[in-house]
Amino acid sequence: MARVKRVIDGDTFETNSGQRVRLAGVDAPEKGKPRSAKAIEKLKSLIEKKDIIVDPIGISYGRIVADVKVDGKSVNKSMQRHLKRA
């Protein structure tokens, strides 16, 4: 289990232990780009102040690439659905 220290953008966050985690299979707009604010807010709503499970599947640019779950639900899939609608 982990906790989120801060959300960096719509597909990346930092845990309280200092690990940067990127959601596998999620390609959110970069900070400052159109729709990025909505993606950031959505990710915050899913993971802030909650216990998360980080299942690492690789490393990219110094970040852990992972499948992330909250209450047994996939954060990755929730973000993918959100971004398709945005």
Question: What are these regions, as identified by a protein language model?
Answer:
Residues M1-A86:
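Small beta-barrel nucleic-acid-binding modules, primarily SNase/OB-fold domains
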